[in-house]
């Protein structure tokens, strides 16, 4: 489990939020590795020996740009957003794609199994709900803490199947490439091994009514070695589309 250092300045809202996740409260930072820091009105991810940190902020910077420009993105075409599908994001991570999808007016159920990442994302959604510019978008995201492959079958029984299951599995870290930003390096170190790709894709194809959309690097291998029905390809990213079991490609 991940350590969390709760500063005296942490608000009651932050203290309440972190109690929802299995984190280990500590009185000082660990000697090495990563930990969460709760201070003021924010939860951040820290790496011992580094000055920078990672927070989930949907109200500014790159997240704001993607939110306001999301309608023209390839992801919008991949999920056929004009049909207003319901989307389950089975690998939510830091929530960037979930937020873009929600900014398109879609209802998104997001799953994240790592407690520290889920805490960071939950905190980002909480703060986005307080901002007039992002509150409507944030309200369309429903975060579930846990393993999507385990939770989706049970959720189908109570809510029915979603139109789309969206997958963005963690790519192998490109250690020699400058393209790996420090934030993602923190993320890789925190999360470690990715979910079982075969089980994840299999469950997604059992769950979706219309399609499974998988985000990959443009030249990356197919998820679980399985070829998709078709693709949407951009300059650096592509979206592989798989049909649900029993669906007719035509």
Curated annotation (Swiss-Prot):
Q: What is its main location?
A: cytoplasm
An annotated Gene Ontology molecular function: rRNA (guanine-N2-)-methyltransferase activity
Q: Where does S-adenosyl-L-methionine bind?
A: 96-97, 168
Output the InterPro entries linked to this UniProt entry: 16SrRNA_methylTrfase_J, SAM-dependent_MTases_sf
Q: What chemistry does it catalyse, as a reaction equation?
A: guanosine(1516) in 16S rRNA + S-adenosyl-L-methionine = N(2)-methylguanosine(1516) in 16S rRNA + S-adenosyl-L-homocysteine + H(+)
One GO CC term of this entry? cytoplasm
Q: Which UniProt keywords apply?
A: Cytoplasm, Methyltransferase, rRNA processing, S-adenosyl-L-methionine, Transferase
UniProt cross-references to Pfam families, sorted A to Z: SAM_MT
Q: Where in the cell is it found?
A: Cytoplasm
This molecule's function is given as: Specifically methylates the guanosine in position 1516 of 16S rRNA.
Protein name per UniProt = Ribosomal RNA small subunit methyltransferase J
List the gene name: rsmJ
């Amino acid at each position: 489990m991940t350590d969390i250092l709760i500063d005296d300045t942490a608000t009651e809202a932050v203290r309440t939020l972190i109690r929802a996740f299995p984190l280990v409260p500590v009185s000082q930072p660990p000697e090495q590795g990563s930990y969460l820091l709760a201070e003021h009105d924010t939860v951040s991810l820290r790496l011992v020996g580094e000055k920078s940190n990672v927070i989930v902020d949907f109200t500014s910077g790159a997240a704001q740009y993607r939110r306001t420009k999301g309608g023209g993105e390839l992801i919008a075409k991949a999920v056929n957003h004009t049909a207003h599908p319901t989307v389950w994001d089975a690998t939510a991570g830091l929530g960037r794609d979930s937020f873009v999808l929600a900014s398109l007016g879609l209802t998104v159920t997001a799953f994240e199994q790592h407690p520290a990442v889920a805490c960071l994302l939950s905190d980002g959604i909480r703060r986005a709900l307080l901002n007039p510019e992002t509150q409507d978008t944030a309200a369309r995201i429903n975060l579930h803490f846990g393993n999507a492959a385990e939770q989706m079958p049970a959720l189908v029984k109570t809510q029915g199947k979603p139109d789309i299951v969206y997958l963005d599995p963690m790519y192998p870290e490109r250690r020699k490439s400058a393209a790996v930003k420090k934030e993602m390096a923190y993320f890789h170190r925190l999360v470690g091994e990715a979910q079982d790709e075969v089980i994840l894709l299999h469950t997604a194809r059992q769950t979706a009514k219309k399609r499974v959309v998988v985000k990959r690097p443009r030249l990356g291998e197919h998820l679980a070695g399985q070829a998709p029905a078709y693709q949407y390809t951009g300059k650096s990213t592509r979206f592989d589309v798989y049909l649900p079991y029993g669906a007719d490609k035509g």
